[in-house]
Amino acid sequence: MTLPIDEIRDEFERRLHAANRLVVTAETGAGKSTRVPVWLAELFPGLILVVEPRRVACDALADFLSAERGEATGGFFGSRVRFSDRSSERTRVLFCTPGVALRMLVEAPAPGAIVVDEFHERSWQMDLVVAAAASVPRLREVPLILTSATIDAEAAARPLAATTLHATGRMFPVDVSYEAETIEPNAEQIGPRAANAIGKALRTHEGDVLVFLPGLKEIRAVEASLGRCPEEVLVVHGSQPPEAMRRVFQRSTRRRIYLATNVAETSITLPGVRIVIDSGLAKTQLHRAGRAVLATVPISQASMQQRAGRAGRVAAGVCVRLWSERFGVEPYQRPEIERVELDDLLLQAAELGLVGAAFD
């Protein structure tokens, strides 16, 4: 199957041979997460380290690419997250979370290449991985690739002296509409409001439904409002056991409603989804009055774009936003390094031997 990202394959190779730092951008569903690691495995010896923001994406991508290759996960493609290692000596492409990547950069031999996928998420651990790749002497010659659908590519490339490369085109169009009655995203009455939007979408459009909600509490509220509906309702949340998450990616003969947090926002494709219902909210860690809090906040324009793109990965789709188009949102979420206490970052930076590493 040809994907939009394939159009830059030759240029990707040329630019990496000219300079080993590259920022790759393309629309959601273009194939960044699945194609780029494979290209790198063909170009460079050693382990290709692919850093994903969440464990769900690590396991899902390793499973998907292994299935395409006709083998079990842990062969050519593997995943490694906290408390779970599905890799072997034969693994060439390893999908891992930022925390695992940092430990490997300290303890393991230098990888053949490093990919930081969905870099717009800008967790402090992702930033530290990039800082290490750019600053630690034994890693400076390792090719470093940042990928995203929504990042400001020039701003990301500048501190790294990296080049940028963009793939045009997307998989399928997505029609976006707004709920005019609600001015701004809010969690009040989210259960009945989302259930009403789901019911309307199921009656007027084809395909499965993906609903973005800020947390498990809101997921349970929508689940209760749906009641005993004929569709199969599945929860997509980081607390779900691996067996439950693997079921999410298996095809079904029944129509499905996926109730998800932002773990479903990037890197993964849920089969059959052509409808997205977006609450416009997410849980974000903030530092307030001397302590860390997990707050429910409106998402950025970048996240809005990512979520809408989930509806256009398998066919033309629709996205319903549960707030008014008049509500203004920030273009990007502030990097986590600007929102939280930096004790853990400083400890890991010291362990890596980083001094004075900084990102705009």
Regions picked out by a protein language model, each given a short descriptive name:
Residues M1-D360:
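P-loop NTPase motor module signature
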